[in-house]
Amino acid sequence: MTSASQAAPVALPVMPDAEDARIMAKAALFAPPPSVMEDGRKDLVGLSREQLTEALAEIGFPAFRAKQLWHWIYHRGETDFRVMSSIAKPQQETLAERFVISRPAVTECLTSVDETRKWLFRFRDGQEAETVYIPDPVEDRGAVCISSQVGCTLSCRFCHTGTQPLVRNLGPAEIVGQFMAARDAYGEWPSPKGETPRLLSTIVLMGMGEPLYNYENVKQAMRIVMDGDGIALSRRRITLSTSGVVPMMDRCGTELAVNLAISLHAVTDELRDELVPLNRKYPIRELIAACRRYPAASNARRITFEYIMLDGINDSEAEARELVRLIAGIPAKVNLIPFNPWPGSQYTPSRPKALERFSRIVMEAGFASPIRTPRGRDILAACGQLRTESRKERRID
């Protein structure tokens, strides 16, 4: 495994234009609280290497201690300074007095009949988000579906999370902490190296929230995850799903270069305006153009177009052909997802014949189009079913 210094070169940050700046200004209104305990101790999880070095310098620790701590936190998964044998006991005590290495609290953990597991995590301010582990049905590996926000601002009509207004963004510690807590649950520490099999083999940013509306925090969390001296998960094993925040897609491709998934779900603006209201701001033409220029896309790393199959709504043969026309020339695959019902939902999943017919048309055009087998439906852990009871407190002036 390469070290951080030998990893893929870090891209220079892209200077934001006016629309990027507007998005980031709005994100600041939903900023996470500081990663500080009530007793004043600072959380080291979620800090970049530079921030960790600075935090230790403030208490007189040399820079090499940051490298040691990084190894203990992200490679070994350790939360107790007292067992860090490469650090002298007096310094262990100083670290414990000034810092913590946190995990989100597990409020609830449910396991499906198909072994999918869902956690309800509570953060320091009492807000909650859900995380799901989806095991591969054949091999000893699986994906961790991570949330980026508490609630969501997009109000997609078929999505349970969309019925929960946005409360706030999650910070880097809360995002990477979901993956670390999942590793705790499955005992996958220290981090597997090289070709060693990983039970938690991939991350999909497909949980609660729109990752590109919380881009800076997501970016920092994923850079921590990808660092070769810690968790060391390759960017090829990370997929970010967006409903189409077009201005941030270029930055994501340049700065993170992770795999991209697009929540498409319709092939006309008229229908997508209804199903995915964000389409009114960034219509299909602009979204597809952004996909064509996404820097990380290639035949080896295809863009995934996610398509929720709704009975009688978006599952006709004509729509399958239009989908093929839209994505022609893009290195892509199409995931067909039968709608997963949730309490109060108004849709039903497409019928098996419609699913098979749609898939066949897309496949015959040269695109892989698997029909996703629902996982975790019985515990409301399937695609589009996540939701918590967190609410944004009204400010009292």
From Swiss-Prot:
Work out whether the entry's keyword set contains Ribonucleoprotein.
no
- PROSITE patterns associated with the record: RADICAL_SAM (PS51918)
Q: What does the record give as cofactor? A: [4Fe-4S] cluster
Q: Name one Pfam family in it.
A: Radical_SAM
Please name the InterPro entries in this protein's record. Answer: Aldolase_TIM (IPR013785), Methyltransferase_A (IPR040072), RlmN_N (IPR048641), RNA_MTrfase_RlmN (IPR027492), rRNA_lsu_MTrfase_RlmN/Cfr (IPR004383), rSAM (IPR007197)
- Residues binding S-adenosyl-L-methionine are G209, E210, S241, S263, L264, H265, N340
Where found, per UniProt?
Cytoplasm
Q: Cite the binding residues for [4Fe-4S] cluster.
A: C152, C156, C159
Q: What EC designation does it have?
A: 2.1.1.192
Q: Which terms are listed as keywords in the entry?
A: 4Fe-4S, Cytoplasm, Disulfide bond, Iron, Iron-sulfur, Metal-binding, Methyltransferase, rRNA processing, S-adenosyl-L-methionine, Transferase, tRNA processing
Q: Name one GO biological process term.
A: tRNA methylation
- Residue numbers annotated as active site: E130, C383
S-S bridge residues: C145-C383
Superkingdom per UniProt = Bacteria
Can the keyword Ion transport be found in this entry's annotation?
Answer: no
Any one annotated GO CC term: cytoplasm
What is the protein's major site of localization? cytoplasm
The annotation note on the cofactor reads:
Binds 1 [4Fe-4S] cluster. The cluster is coordinated with 3 cysteines and an exchangeable S-adenosyl-L-methionine.
Q: List, in alphabetical order, the Gene Ontology terms for molecular function in this entry.
A: 4 iron, 4 sulfur cluster binding; metal ion binding; rRNA (adenine(2503)-C2-)-methyltransferase activity; rRNA binding; tRNA (adenine(37)-C2)-methyltransferase activity; tRNA binding
Q: Which residues form the Radical SAM core domain?
A: 138-377
Catalytic reactions on record: adenosine(2503) in 23S rRNA + 2 reduced [2Fe-2S]-[ferredoxin] + 2 S-adenosyl-L-methionine = 2-methyladenosine(2503) in 23S rRNA + 5'-deoxyadenosine + L-methionine + 2 oxidized [2Fe-2S]-[ferredoxin] + S-adenosyl-L-homocysteine; adenosine(37) in tRNA + 2 reduced [2Fe-2S]-[ferredoxin] + 2 S-adenosyl-L-methionine = 2-methyladenosine(37) in tRNA + 5'-deoxyadenosine + L-methionine + 2 oxidized [2Fe-2S]-[ferredoxin] + S-adenosyl-L-homocysteine
Family as reported in the entry's similarity comment: Belongs to the radical SAM superfamily. RlmN family.
What other comment is given for this protein? Reaction proceeds by a ping-pong mechanism involving intermediate methylation of a conserved cysteine residue.
PANTHER family given for it?
Answer: 23S RRNA METHYLTRANSFERASE, RADICAL SAM CORE DOMAIN-CONTAINING PROTEIN
Purpose of the protein = Specifically methylates position 2 of adenine 2503 in 23S rRNA and position 2 of adenine 37 in tRNAs. m2A2503 modification seems to play a crucial role in the proofreading step occurring at the peptidyl transferase center and thus would serve to optimize ribosomal fidelity.
Q: What is this protein called?
A: Dual-specificity RNA methyltransferase RlmN
Organism, by scientific name, is Granulibacter bethesdensis (strain ATCC BAA-1260 / CGDNIH1)
User: Upper lineage ranks?
Assistant: Bacteria, Pseudomonadati, Pseudomonadota, Alphaproteobacteria, Acetobacterales
